[in-house]
Amino acid sequence: MAVHEELPVVVVGAGPVGLAAAAHLLERGIEPLVLEAGASAGSAVAAWGHVRLFSPWRYDVDAAARRLLEATGWTAPDPDALPTGAELVERYLTPLAATPQIAARLRTSSRVVAISREGADKTRSLGRERLAYRVRVQGPDGATHHVRARAVLDASGTWGQPNPVGTGGLPAFGEVGSSVVTGPLPDVLGADRALFAGRRTLVVGMGHSAANTLLSLVELARDEPGTRIAWAVRGGSPRRLYGGGTDDELPARGLLGTRLRDAVESGLVTLATRTSIERIEPVGPSGGTWDVGAAGTSDVPTAPGPVRVQGTTRDGELDLEVDTVVGATGFRPDLDMLREVRLDLDPVVESPRALADLIDPNHHSCGTVPPHGEALLAHPDTGFYVVGMKSYGRAPTFLLATGYEQVRSIAAALAGDREAADLVQLDLPATGVCSSDLALDPVSGEVAEVSCCGTSPAAAEPVLVTFGAPAGSLGFATGTAHGRSADEQEDPR
């Protein structure tokens, strides 16, 4: 039986999944309260506004949200068009947040800093399920207050929690606070151009965010002499990222891998495999400061001095002088605010335990993750759910449409409609469309999202290239076999 029905369901985050949750709750007659840390809905999406999704609009708009919007006279975008992050905000999230139903229940500049049961820490069990949730919120003036809730959906995402570039999941010495290390999606050809033009960049990471940045740098190098590019991956080779080429079901994804392979084999990009980065230290006096945020954007048009990146690679010692390091190493969930909530998390992926085997990137790509709903997302504290990208923990296989289905199912469960909650369905292409994977548009050169799913062709022969310098000066050996697929076959020692 539901308790505290007079209280709202707090939704943490006003991104696509958070706003979809509010829409589904409203359709079920349940009062939502959406708390967004940013100044407006979709703040995290706006941070990568220059990125074009590969998933067309038909998969980017939630059904309940669409019904709210259509009641206002909203005109839906072309279902087959590919939006940028900025367009997703402008044409979907902003109008959705402005609907009378959502606007009255949305609080921006309201950062959730802690969640607990009212009057009970994590250790208290007696009567726990009858207690309301207590959500501690930091407002725009820095003051904190509490909001009482009957249930909580944490849709805060992972954008502000990038993985470090250092080895073993820990920041390299000198990494924390370094103005040289950017976030995963800098606007190489736009706002952040001065940070990369005519300079030496090391990109660290094995996903499509890394590939997108690398290809943008290759394009920049055509116009800006002296632009040099190195790429470090932790795995044995990039075979999986190269994908299926012309055999790929999604042409833009296949083209992404083909372009990247060509850039490596031609020597435009220097690849180091089995890379462990231990230290990042300044070289000489700094040439200025660059305040780089999570998206790699900056308000200061000067760049820092060079750094020396040290560690090891498959071929031996790594000792590389660069001007910028792009950390495209993925994300992890921020669990600090959930310390007083009883969670059942998988120790590897940091997703709900029941979901972990379905999304583990060692075994699954986005197209092989089955639809799932409330039953797999529940935690020991009844009425608390982590949804959206954060529900996948460290797994990069999240689909935006999957998040919409998650919150539809949870809203049904909170309304007492068990049958609807358990009837989980998802309409997607056979290959899936991963919301976190990115590529370059084959015609315009703009950034476009791609699926994470693909075939893995046989590795090509290794090629020796250098980092825009005389042969032998850096001498990274390159290969074409990928990350975790290779890790499964090779002992990391």
Enumerate the language-model features and the residues they cover.
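Flavin (primarily FAD) cofactor-binding/catalytic cores of flavoenzymes
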Residues: 2-44, 50, 81-435
